[in-house]
Regions:
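Feature responds to low-complexity, polar/acidic, surface-exposed segments characteristic
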Residues: 1-10, 14-34, 40-69, 75, ...
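Glycan-recognition patch characteristic of GH18 chitinases/ENGases
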Residues: 112-213
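Short, acidic/polar
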Residues: 119-133, 202-225, 277-285, 414-427
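Conserved, mostly hydrophobic/aromatic
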Residues: 137, 234, 295, 349, ...
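Substrate-binding surface in catalytic domains of secreted glycosidases
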Residues: 146-168, 244-377
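Active-site groove signature of glycoside hydrolases
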Residues: 212-247, 297-306
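Glycan-binding loop/region signatures in secreted carbohydrate-active enzymes
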Residues: 346-348, 353-423, 451-457
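Acidic/aromatic/glycine-rich contiguous surface patches that form carbohydrate-binding/processing clefts
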Residues: 422-458
Length: 458
């Protein structure tokens, strides 16, 4: 091939955008809409998501081949239908259509992160300068509780074994962030399933919960001389079932009405949908999106926490902390045009940069049934001392191997590559907001290669 386009075609083939199994390029043939979609998805490097995408329902009734590629291209907003549920895969892609597809690709790939949020909780003050660069921060200073006497309180004190409390010297960080133009929210945490049912499944209790929250976000904090909160972030975790789903929405509607009257905003943290279907399904994404100002999808805690004796014996250690296909599945669900958040600008991708899990092997057998969680400094020390690090293109997560006598440690973790990959995928799905759990744990130094995670959002 000596034609003018040879180098471009060769480069495209080398990067997987073209099927190099074919013997001929057929340069004079017209390209079909299906071929164009496949080529663009391959060129973007998302082949590893095709199987997951193919399992989803197609918006088109006439797609019989390359369903995963076309579904992905549709999710990315690269292609659209021809009306009446038709994609017309074998139709010729006109020059106009090809140009439009490529322009959409370019715009998505080069879009900016337009919203950065962080959770501020335990030992977060050390990263106050990072917090000042964010658009909003949620202070993890309260926990919702249903007391034995039937009262519902927003506990902000270190009583009743509560670690979600207002710290000494709170006024300093509030002043610094607000002077920097950062929105400050009160994060209201609840993870007890029984208490969630008691509070949400009773109309009087829902109202009592709303009143307790409103009291906390309107009362004057003495050392500050005013209330520190410009909004509320609801972080009710572990909700399951249709009853809780419905009543959680009722609670949010009531809370939003009260907050709006005070000129305050509402953020809601939600669990992501997962491929196996066994996830926390008590979150009506569409309804929540209509109520909340921001919806934070917590795309973390995917990794195995405990393993069975059989798995230990097998020596199976492939437990990425944020598998790429799972993150895609969650983003697909929360941006679904029928059941997801209608306005994708409200959706925020939540990530946990310090997440990691370690499995220790001896003679090919895993000796710990419970995953080990390391602090990031320990991981950096391992890498500095010669630990072997690899990057899984399938899961888009790094993992390292550490030799310690007769023990081999296998550790899955996050780094700037895995965070960037998730952010890039989210942008392709129309999600340009990110959130971090949590300040104090965001790697922001160039200790080793790919260690400066904060650099991905600066």
């Amino acid at each position: 091939m000596n034609q003018w386009y040879f180098k471009s075609v060769e480069t495209a083939a080398q990067h997987g955008a073209l099927d190099d199994s074919a013997q001929n390029f057929r340069p004079n043939d017209n390209i079909t809409r299906e071929e164009m979609a496949v080529m663009l998805v391959k060129g973007l490097g998302y082949d590893n998501l095709v199987e997951t995408a193919a399992a989803a329902a197609s918006p088109f009734t006439d797609v019989t081949s390359n369903k995963g590629y076309i579904n992905l291209a549709y999710d990315f907003g690269i292609v659209s239908g021809k009306g009446a549920g038709q994609f017309v895969p074998n139709g010729t892609a006109t020059r106009e259509e090809a140009a439009a597809m490529m322009l959409r690709c370019y715009n998505k790939m080069n879009s900016d992160t337009d919203f950065v949020h962080g959770f501020y909780a335990f030992s977060s003050y050390g990263q106050k300068d990072l917090a000042k660069e964010m658009d909003a921060v949620s202070f993890g200073w309260s926990k919702m509780e249903y007391r034995d006497d039937g009262s519902i309180v927003v506990n902000t004190l270190y009583e009743n074994n509560n670690e979600w409390a207002v710290p000494e010297g709170y006024e300093q960080i509030v002043e610094e962030l607000q002077n920097s133009g950062v929105q400050t929210n009160l994060n209201v945490f609840l993870s007890d399933a029984t208490q969630a049912q008691t509070i949400l499944n009773n109309a009087e209790n829902r109202t009592a919960a709303v009143n307790a929250i409103m009291e906390e976000v309107t009362v004057t904090y003495k050392k500050l001389g005013r209330n520190p909160y410009e909004g509320v972030t609801i972080d009710f975790e572990g909700l399951r079932g249709s009853t809780l789903k419905q009543n959680f929405v009722a609670f949010l509607k009531e809370l939003d009405t009260a907050l709006t009257a005070e000129g305050k905003s509402l953020y809601v943290a939600v669990h992501p949908a997962t491929k196996d279907g066994s996830y926390y399904d008590g979150y009506d994404y569409k309804a929540i999106g209509e109520i909340a100002d921001k919806v934070i999808m917590m795309a973390y805690d995917y990794e195995a926490k405990n393993i069975s004796a059989d798995v230990q014996q097998s020596g199976f250690t492939t437990t990425p902390v944020s598998p790429f296909d799972q993150v895609y599945y969650g983003l697909h669900a929360i941006t679904d045009e029928n059941t997801g958040v209608t306005d994708s600008s409200k959706v925020v991708l939540g990530m946990s940069p310090s997440s990691n899990v370690e499995w220790d092997l001896q003679n090919g057998v895993i000796v710990n049934s419970q995953g080990i969680d390391n602090d990031y400094d320990t991981l950096q020390t391992y890498l500095q001392n010669g630990a072997k690090s690899e990057y899984s293109e399938k899961y888009r997560n790094p993992y390292m191997t550490v030799r310690d006598g007769d023990t081999t440690k296998v550790i899955w973790y996050e780094d700037s590559r895995s965070i960037q990959d998730k952010m890039d995928l989210a942008k392709m799905m129309g999600v340009n907001g990110v959130s971090f759990w949590r300040l104090g744990l965001i790697p922001d130094e160039n200790t080793t290669a790919y260690s400066n995670i904060w650099s991905t959002v600066k």
